[in-house]
Structures are given as structure tokens and as C-alpha cells.
Amino acid sequence: MGPVSVLPKPQSISTWEGDLAKMTHLQAGLSPDTIEKARLELNENPDVLHQDIQQVRDMIITRPDIGFLRTDDAFILRFLRARKFHQADAFRLLAQYFQYRQLNLDMFKNFKADDPGIKRALIDGFPGVLENRDHYGRKILLLFAANWDQSRNSFTDILRAILLSLEVLIEDPELQINGFILIIDWSNFSFKQASKLTPSILKLAIEGLQDSFPARFGGVHFVNQPWYIHALYTLIKPFLKDKTRKRIFLHGNNLNSLHQLIHPEFLPSEFGGTLPPYDMGTWARTLLGPDYSDENDYTHTSYNAMYVKHTCSNLERECSPKPMKRSQSVVEAGTLKHEEKGENENTQPLLALD
């Protein structure tokens, strides 16, 4: 099952076809449905696309304190899409993107897949990335929290691996428009592990993902979260924007509520889905290339979206799965019964992103 088609109303077909005819090279490769979605949801207009980009670029002079290391059309466009073509908001996000990197120089030193810290995090499944997209065309990212071996991976390196993964994925214009979903499985995540999630490092993650990256997040789903994760969530709430809070869903062990938002056919069996269990090494092999190894140092430094697209299936056949801890929420698909939603649980579906 592919992404849901968003077809124009009959009376708008001629206008819609005209927009496709005027499509710029920046929209090349997008499906007609995605182009129409960008027009309806993001206010993307091919007639003024280059003017929109230039107006954001013209604002750079107002922030001489920031080094804008990349200002090409394709790069600025992703910030416009992330902010629904509100130019001032798009520029603010662009400035925060580079300012975050200036303020956290150590995080972005040797910022590539073969950096030892990033490589370890990737191999341990941080993050997991499902091959197929959901029914809205969104990419699904997974985090199995209990797999965090604190003697092996620092939280900062896990965050770096997530940010690097997003940098690779956001090169795909379809994902700039359709966005992402994040599912965090807290099964077997101990209180001792949780005690390492200090306010300062959580704030660092929120600033990097919420305030400084041009991605549209359609939802962050907590599954099997213990009471102390609820407490941590209360702790970080002041750092979250209202829009972000509305997109955090606390499912507990109620996978039925998860399936109301993400159909089981797009989920691995750990989340009651119909897909096979997730192989924790899949995304690491995609980024690291055919020389991926759990044990040997990796020396190949290049990666790009085209390489990811064309080699992923071959690598999956060549490499065996890496055994990791699994979620306790494995159930047979279709056997879940409807449960009453808890008063404090956000389980409203998101049909469109703000």
C-alpha cells in the first residue's frame, strides 16, 4: 500500500496541470501527488519558488554573527518547506540550524558515518529506519531505548547519529514534504539508564531536533514507557513548543492506539505490525556501505542519498542481522481489542502537519 493519493477537485484539474507544467527543476522527481500536497499543505507555488528562496537568502545579511555555510536554492528550499513557506520563519530556522552547529562545535567535528562514536551508535541501531514509508508517505524512525549501552555509547554520540541520519534522509525532496515519524520503545529501559538523561542533554536534543532542523515531524510515539519516563516527559515539557507537545503520543502498552495512527502493515512485529522483526544493522549498513562490520573499523567516508537508494536492498541480502534486545510488545497482528484512551494520553490522529 503506497502513500494516500491527494487528488485535486475536478474543477481545479486545469490549474493543477498548469502547475505541473510550470514545475521548476527544484521539483523535478516529485510525484504529482506530492507536488499537489506541497501546494495544498505547504503553500508551495512553482510560479514564485525562486523568489521565495531569494527573499530568504536576502535576510542572511541581518545575521552577520552566523556563518551560513550553505545557501544554495535546494538547501534553502527545505527550510521553506519545513515552515510552510513563511519566509521569516524559514529564515529563523535556517539561522538556528547554523547557530546550533556553531555553539556545539564538538558535536559536528568529523560529522560523518565513519566517526567512531557515530559508527558505534549506528551499529547499535540508533536510529532504526524502516525501508517503507507509511500511508502518508512519511519515513518511520525507531529507537529501542534499552539498547543504549552507556559504557559503549554516549548520549551525545547517539544524538549525532540521529542528526546525521536526518541529514541524509532530508536530501529526499519527498521527505521534505511528507515528513517523519519517530517511535520510541521504552521496554526494559531501566531507572539507572534513565538517570543519565539529564536536563542539559535532553535540552541539547530538543534544540537540535525541534528548533534547528528542517524536518516535518508528524508524531513522536512512546511505547511501553515506565513511570519514570512519564516523569522525564514532565521535566522537559517547558522546553517543548505547543505544536511539539500535541505531536507526542503516550501509548503505554496499548498498541491499538498506535495502530490507529500508523497502520500495522507499515510496522515490524515489535510493534504488533505485519512486517518481520526489525534488523538493527539495516540503517548502519546503508550509511557505512558494503564494508560494514560489527567489529572492524570502517574506512569508507562517502555517503549520499543516491547511494543509499540503490544499494540498500543488496546490502540487506549480504549481511546477517545483529542480535539486539527486543520490545516486549510483540503481539499477533489483528488481535488487539479497542481500549479506552487514558485521560492524559494524546492519541488524536495527525492528518496534516502544521
UniProtKB/Swiss-Prot annotation:
It holds the Pfam family CRAL_TRIO. Residues 345-354 have a biased composition (Polar residues). One of its GO terms (cellular component) is early endosome membrane. Expressed in brain with no expression detected in non-neuronal tissues (at protein level). InterPro entries: CRAL-TRIO_dom, CRAL-TRIO_dom_sf, CRAL/TRIO_N_dom, CRAL/TRIO_N_dom_sf. One of its GO terms (biological process) is lysosome organization. Residues 317-354 are annotated as: Disordered. Residues 118-279 form the CRAL-TRIO domain. GO terms for molecular function: phosphatidylinositol bisphosphate binding; phosphatidylinositol-3,5-bisphosphate binding. Keywords: Cytoplasmic vesicle, Endosome, Golgi apparatus, Lipid-binding, Membrane. Residues 335-344 have a biased composition (Basic and acidic residues). It is found in: Golgi apparatus, trans-Golgi network membrane; Early endosome membrane; Cytoplasmic vesicle, Clathrin-coated vesicle. Its main location: Golgi. It is a peripheral membrane protein. Signal peptide: none annotated. Required for normal morphology of late endosomes and/or lysosomes in neurons. Binds phosphatidylinositol 3,5-bisphosphate (PtdIns(3,5)P2). Forms a complex with clathrin heavy chain and gamma-adaptin. The CRAL-TRIO domain is required for targeting to the membrane and for binding PtdIns(3,5)P2. PANTHER family: ALPHA-TOCOPHEROL TRANSFER PROTEIN-RELATED, CLAVESIN-1. Binding to PtdIns(3,5)P2 is not required for localization. This is Clavesin-1.
